[in-house]
Amino acid sequence: AMRVPGKQAFVQALYAVVNRLEGLKVNISTGKAVTPRELQDEGFEEIVVATGVRPRIPEFPGVTEGLEGKIDGVTVATYAELISCEKTPGEYVAVIGAGGIGYDVAEFLLEDRQGTPQTLNSWNSQWGVVEASDVHGNLSTPKPERPQRRVVMLQRKPTRMGRSLGKTTGWVHRATVAMGGTEQIVGVTYEKIDSEGLHITVPVEDPQVTLKKIKQVKSGTFEGRTLDRAEKQELLEQIERETKENREQRVINVDTVVLCTGQESIRPEGAEQEGASNVHIIGGADVAAELDAKRAIRQAVELAARI
């Protein structure tokens, strides 16, 4: 996370935790997989499973081959492989998934600063902030830096992209990717990845028009007439059917596809054994969906207070 633009503060947070652990003489052992049963056999009275998450891999043709490097001219990477620099992106990148991770990855691709913070002058220029006292509101025309790559973001839902982002900071992420000229496509069905790029289908009708129709039907009126319950259900099913059937194919000639399609918990064997009241699962290992660092930290603090 600390390599994502705007999140460099994680570096200092991690250093603080490491220093605290060293000061408390905590023994940290790495490079070996263990199970709760093995730790119980060694005499540990309480066991905390905080093993985090792994990227969820979608299932459609070309994903597995791409991850294994078997597609000529196209790199397929998980978000973890990308941000850790295990795999290097090209010049034209498709980001599959538009949740919080998808937006972080898009910003990383547009503004890859190799983990160094953005300078104040660069930030001021990007957002149009000026120090001249004679400028109204100290704001002028934003002058964002030239994006380092061409990025297209895709999501399956037909809803407006970025709706699930945080209420206080979501607008910043949406504005940042917009400044980078990111193309955004919603209502996508992923068909395959091959040497030509990413193959998808999209609705023929603008998803925003479809959503407007659905909203009207659910309100009980449509095209000037009042609907009863049966008519509403029939129209909603018709709209859904037409959306699935009336689609067009599209090939996006990207050289890189990044998978930001959710996460799944990592749990060692036996972590959920029945009757093991001294085995505690927290953080991403507990619930991977919409993983929230604040929630994970709260779970850890509350558990530590109990034991």
Each language-model region and where it sits:
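Residue-level signal for pocket-adjacent positions within structured domains
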Residues: 5, 71-72, 77, 185
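Pocket-edge structural micro-motifs
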Residues: 186, 202, 283
